[in-house]
């Protein structure tokens, strides 16, 4: 992932302003350590921090059309760029970058070209011929993007909050699937509006081979790279399928010819964690070069402040899962790898979270999947993008391919419903699609392994250790004042309070706290789905183990009232609050 920053229509074209833009752009350099670029045209500035994945030799940004009247700074990957180039025969391209097509598409089609892009992207385009501009973000928000407004009437755009939060009167997350155009009076326009967006119940019959074909296509197109890459492999269904398909199709690709035909896979976890065991087994089955990274609870706790600074959230489940991903990304980048494929998005599309066992009917099931996909940019996309980008590593997510989402979301949700009495566990339609007896994609027990959320799979003591640490830093008196100190999204647990304190230190603006979602949740549900089971109101925790009666290692946080237990041995040196009685909601 690259880092982009744009300041448009400001009242200052001085050298001091240019220096300030460069200073702010450097805050995004972790996203793109390979090269920096800046373009200034009067009161407009476009800056870029590049992570070179395609055409590393000549693809530096900003990018231009032939006469340099149209300028683009972009963070993204356009998978169909070669096909798009064929339709632009009268245009001359300056680079081999996949993003070079954007300026030329605009020149040919105006602002109506965005839906032609198959990929992930955030970009700012400046048309110097009339001093107009447009900003756009990909369909579901795989790339991160923020928009803000300065006191002088300027418009700011940045890949991360840290690039604009000090200089804007107000800022917010740029909505996925939208564009913002100065030509339309400075308003947002939704360019991505698929049939499933209205949440009406679809009726397409389930065809396993259609799902298989659509997902294989989504993975294959993401093998486009000019740099070393690998796959994140936790041993769960989603990452294992991504790894299996990649291993099958890697031979013969340009990447294989340049870097070798053997796939590299990566896994992280506490010693003895479920993911480490399963990931190793899948790697051996697929024949990948497997890299296992171990961390301790203390390692994770030590990284929390860095994680919150980079991921820019105080959401509990996002921080829990981002921390091991953050640690793993640093290790991966140290090996010279610049891109990884990852399995985010499947649980939202297929209802894979364990709370979906309680969906009362297919309409509720489908509407919850729609809500989850629409909110992905606030949670898993945010994590996958920023936890990896902290070290100049790009994460690609084939489950969030536009065509695959449309195929999967057109299914009659009755086929996705979880029915244990019929042998249908969560994500049954996906598992069945890849259950091939003649040429197996995965071992059966991996193909039908129960869902583990990433923050659980890396080791159950990870979350338990976080809670114990938070309890050492947040006392009951602080919690009693939580609603006064934090009236918006008031933290309900000591762990949430602890993360909020750190977040507010980095991002104290009201606009910043409003970018983070809130509301009731159990096992990563939306607030609406909490209504499915009355008992959940007493056990509000985003961990999958909160799904009592569903998860094999479920716990009931509402029924445990004990002295605070000793934390994991990795944090034994932290003083304990002796004798305090608390309700443990693990």
Swiss-Prot record:
Positions with a binding annotation for ATP: 232, 268, 342-343
Q: List residues of the Asparagine synthetase domain.
A: 194-517
Query: Could you say which residues bind L-glutamine here?
Result: 50-54, 75-77, 98
Catalytic activity annotation: L-aspartate + L-glutamine + ATP + H2O = L-asparagine + L-glutamate + AMP + diphosphate + H(+)
Q: In which pathway does it act?
A: Amino-acid biosynthesis; L-asparagine biosynthesis; L-asparagine from L-aspartate (L-Gln route): step 1/1
Q: Where is the Glutamine amidotransferase type-2 domain?
A: 2-185
Report keywords, A-Z.
Answer: Amino-acid biosynthesis, Asparagine biosynthesis, ATP-binding, Glutamine amidotransferase, Ligase, Nucleotide-binding
Q: Which GO terms describe its biological process?
A: L-asparagine biosynthetic process
Indicate the annotated site residue(s) for Important for beta-aspartyl-AMP intermediate formation. Answer: 344
Q: Which GO terms describe its cellular component?
A: cytosol
Residues of the active site:
2
- Identify the Pfam families for this entry: Asn_synthase (PF00733), GATase_7 (PF13537)
Its EC number(s): 6.3.5.4
Transmembrane region(s): none
- GO molecular function: any one? ATP binding
Q: Which family does the similarity line name? A: Belongs to the asparagine synthetase family.
Name-wise, this protein is Asparagine synthetase [glutamine-hydrolyzing]
């Amino acid at each position: 992932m690259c880092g982009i920053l744009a300041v448009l229509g400001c009242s200052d074209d001085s050298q001091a302003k240019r220096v300030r833009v460069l200073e702010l752009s450097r805050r995004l350099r972790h996203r793109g350590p390979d090269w920096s670029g800046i373009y200034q045209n009067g009161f407009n500035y476009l800056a870029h921090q590049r992570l070179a994945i395609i055409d590393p030799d000549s693809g530096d940004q900003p990018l231009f059309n032939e006469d340099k009247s149209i300028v683009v700074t972009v963070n993204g990957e356009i998978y169909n760029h070669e096909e798009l180039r064929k339709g632009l025969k009268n245009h001359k391209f300056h680079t081999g970058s996949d993003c070079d097509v954007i300026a030329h598409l605009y020149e040919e089609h105006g602002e109506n070209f965005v839906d032609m892009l198959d990929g992930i992207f955030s970009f700012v385009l400046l048309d110097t011929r009339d001093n107009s501009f447009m900003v756009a973000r990909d369909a579901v928000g795989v790339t991160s993007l923020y928009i803000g407004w300065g006191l002088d009437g300027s418009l700011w755009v940045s890949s991360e909050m840290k690039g604009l939060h000090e200089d804007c009167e107000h800022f917010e997350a740029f909505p996925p699937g939208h564009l913002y155009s100065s030509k339309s009076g400075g308003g947002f326009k939704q360019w991505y509006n698929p049939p499933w967006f209205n949440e009406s119940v679809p009726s397409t019959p389930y065809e396993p081979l259609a799902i298989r074909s659509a997902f294989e296509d989504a993975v294959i197109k993401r093998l486009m790279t000019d740099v070393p890459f690998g796959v994140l492999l936790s041993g769960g269904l989603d990452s294992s399928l991504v790894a299996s398909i990649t291993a099958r199709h890697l031979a013969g690709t340009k990447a294989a010819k340049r870097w070798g035909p053997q796939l590299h896979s990566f896994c992280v976890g506490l010693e003895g964690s479920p993911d480490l065991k399963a990931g190793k087994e899948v790697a051996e089955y697929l024949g990948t070069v497997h890299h296992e990274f171990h961390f301790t609870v203390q390692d994770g706790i030590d990284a929390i402040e860095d994680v919150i600074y980079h991921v820019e959230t105080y959401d509990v489940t996002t921080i829990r899962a981002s921390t091991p991903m953050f640690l793993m990304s640093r290790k991966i980048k140290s090996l010279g790898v610049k891109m990884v494929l990852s399995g985010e998005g499947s649980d939202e599309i297929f209802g894979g979270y364990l709370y979906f066992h309680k969906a009362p009917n297919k309409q509720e099931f489908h509407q919850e999947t729609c809500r989850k996909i629409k909110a992905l940019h606030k949670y898993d996309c945010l994590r996958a993008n920023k936890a990896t980008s902290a070290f100049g590593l790009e994460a690609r997510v084939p489950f969030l391919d536009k065509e695959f989402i449309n195929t999967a979301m057109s299914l009659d949700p009755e086929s996705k419903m979880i029915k244990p009495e019929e042998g249908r566990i969560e994500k049954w339609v996906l598992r069945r699609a890849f259950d091939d007896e003649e040429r197996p994609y995965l071992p059966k027990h991996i193909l039908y392994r129960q869902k583990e959320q990433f923050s659980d799979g890396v080791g159950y003591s990870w979350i338990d250790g976080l809670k114990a640490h938070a309890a050492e830093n947040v006392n009951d008196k602080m919690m009693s004042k939580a609603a006064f100190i934090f009236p918006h999204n008031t933290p309900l647990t000591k762990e949430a309070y602890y993360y909020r304190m750190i977040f507010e230190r980095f991002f104290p603006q009201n606009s910043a706290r409003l970018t983070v979602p809130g509301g009731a949740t159990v096992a990563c549900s939306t607030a609406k789905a909490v209504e499915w089971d009355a008992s959940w109101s007493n056990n509000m925790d985003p961990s999958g183990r909160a799904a009592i009666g569903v998860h094999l290692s479920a716990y009931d946080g509402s029924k445990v009232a004990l002295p605070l237990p000793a934390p994991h041995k990795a944090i034994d040196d932290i003083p304990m609050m002796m004798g305090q009685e608390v309700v443990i909601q693990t």
